[in-house]
Amino acid sequence: MSYHFSKTKRFILFIIGLTVAGIGVALSTRPGLGTSPITSLPYVTTFKIPWTLGIATIVINLFFILAQFIILKRRFGWKHIAQLPTLLAFGFFIDFGMWLTKFYIPGSYFLRITEEVIGCLFLAVGIGFQLVANISLMPGDGFIRVVSEEYHIPFGTVKICFDSAIVISAIIFSLCCFHNITGVREGTVIAAFLVGYFIKLQQKTIRKVKMLLLI
């Protein structure tokens, strides 16, 4: 079944999705147990470079847009360029989420794990809203799709390789700068599994949201 709803509703839902996802990144980062795989490299750089997590995310994801341009060349179009404002907005909402959550830092390990899980849930819900809106992709997902389509590799396979490469890059950066592993911990592994799991759980909810948008 195809769904057709106004661009205004889609845009509003998309912004809500970016906001919720940004807060999810902040919630999964604040406990200090690591963060989601795609955010692990930007997060580790913040321990070395005096910039915010949002800015680090923007800078590093710009390379994924550049990589798409290199692969596609003349076929690089507006739908790929649209990833730039999406990235800028997401970076802003990550920093907004970090500001919003700075007032509460969990003390016990149980509370830190709990906040990590809640952050994964927020991130999954935010991604779900973005999928419903279907306006633009984040540069990382855009890069994965381009590689999948151009080289005829299943999207899921490319996603696993991409996330693994980001985490490995974060570990290498950490070892080179700090001579130990910083910023990549059990929370990174938890996020790698839980975000995808929560997205699968909310498939029925996503369909209901689509139906509501038709009203």
List where the protein language model places each region:
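Core subunits and conserved enzymes of cellular information-processing
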Residues: 1-215
